[in-house]
């Protein structure tokens, strides 16, 4: 049975999605990297192997694609046949699972993006990689400070009757504003709802500035699990927000569909034994020109298997020694 694997490695979490030749999801995984993306990817392969052994030993991985900010690292570890940016991967998944969608709001752990689609093709996009305000890591920090499990954050927000106003342009000022609102007696649910509304405004005024946000509007990423953020976007846009199945793993799902469509004759997959290998990454600065690129070097069991990060390909084109 031929299957195709998509892997999305981000700043906070990693995702695996395995599909069959009809784009049916057979296995999916969404977990935190916990600051160690190499070990996270290896653990992902351990879980996938266990799933295959327990469900269908005849599953064959016919192709692997990686995406996300850690796509090159994941590609080297897995032996990817295709490495694609997350904009392309998300657009591909949405065109298959939410046909007709025109706007994609995606908020992850430390970045956020907007994708404008026409006939299933990304025609415009913007990303915020500078400030974490409104992203998953910021919401995690606030839920911890308020002693509310992040899973309950959204449920609490939608109970609010009078959301308070929270300044949300900057994560530092937003936190200070929340503390002030607590001190003057605002209810926790009103503060949480106010934070969600402020973050939605911040997103629309930042990442979404100047974009034509037309329905159907799809909300993806870990933050899309937050009911309060869904409600805040619906209030700000006065439009229904669609949160589709597999909303947290759409990047990996799109990568899997892309590699299925590419249909490599022979996969470069290194095999499940990669989960037991000694994998290390290091970097050095190339001083060959004024760019002074930071080159990343990956080793598996002491052998250099890849280099990347150089603009001119001086190092990445070298055969591993």
Feature names for model-found ranges:
Residues 4-46, 124-125, 129-130, 311-312:
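Short glycine-rich, Thr/Ser-proximal phosphate-binding strand/loop in the N-terminal lobe
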Residues 69-70, 209-236, 244-251:
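Glycine-rich phosphate-binding loops at beta-strand->alpha-helix junctions
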Residues 174-209:
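Adenine-nucleotide phosphate-binding core of ATP-dependent small-molecule kinases
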Residues 113, 261-321:
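Acidic, glycine/GT-rich loop-and beta-edge segments that sit at the periphery of enzyme/chaperone cores
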Residues 34-38, 119-162, 170, 261, ...:
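Glycine-rich phosphate-binding loop plus the immediately following alpha-helix
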Residues 29-33, 52-87, 116, 123-124:
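Short beta-strand-loop/turn "lid" adjacent to the catalytic site in phosphate-handling enzymes
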Residues 136-140, 245-272:
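Glycine-rich phosphate-binding/hydrolytic loop that grips phosphoryl groups
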Residues 1-24, 101-118, 162, 285-299:
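Gly/Thr-rich phosphate-binding beta-strand-loop-beta motif of the actin/hexokinase/Hsp70
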């Amino acid at each position: 049975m031929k299957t195709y694997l998509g892997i999305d490695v981000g700043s906070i979490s990693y995702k695996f999605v395995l599909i069959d030749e009809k784009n049916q999801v057979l296995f999916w995984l969404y977990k935190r990297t916990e600051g160690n993306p190499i070990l996270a990817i290896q653990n992902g392969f351990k879980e996938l192997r266990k799933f295959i052994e327990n469900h269908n030993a005849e599953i064959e991985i016919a192709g692997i694609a990686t995406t996300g900010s850690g796509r090159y690292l994941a590609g080297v570890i897995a032996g990817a046949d295709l490495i694609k940016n997350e904009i392309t991967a998300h657009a591909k998944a949405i065109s298959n699972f939410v046909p007709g969608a025109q706007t994609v709001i995606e908020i992850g752990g430390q970045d956020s993006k907007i994708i404008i689609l026409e006939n299933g093709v990304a025609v415009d996009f913007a990303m915020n990689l500078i400030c974490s305000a409104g992203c998953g890591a910021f919401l995690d920090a606030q839920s911890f400070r308020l002693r509310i499990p992040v899973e309950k954050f959204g449920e609490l927000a939608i109970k609010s009757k009078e959301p308070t106003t929270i300044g949300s342009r900057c994560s530092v000022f937003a936190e200070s504003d929340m503390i002030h609102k607590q001190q003057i007696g605002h209810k926790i649910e009103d503060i949480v709802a106010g934070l969600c509304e402020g973050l939605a405004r911040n997103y629309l005024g930042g990442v979404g500035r100047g974009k034509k946000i037309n329905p159907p509007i799809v909300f993806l990423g870990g933050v899309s699990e937050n009911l309060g953020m869904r409600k805040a976007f619906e209030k700000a846009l006065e439009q229904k927000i669609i949160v589709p199945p597999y909303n947290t793993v759409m990047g990996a799902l799109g990568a899997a569909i892309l590699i299925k469509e590419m249909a490599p004759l022979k996969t470069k997959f290194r095999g499940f034994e990669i989960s037991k290998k000694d994998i290390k990454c290091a970097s050095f600065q190339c001083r060959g020109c004024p760019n002074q690129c930071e080159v990343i070097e990956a080793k598996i069991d002491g052998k250099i298997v890849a280099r990347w990060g150089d603009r001119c390909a001086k190092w990445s084109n070298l055969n591993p020694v």
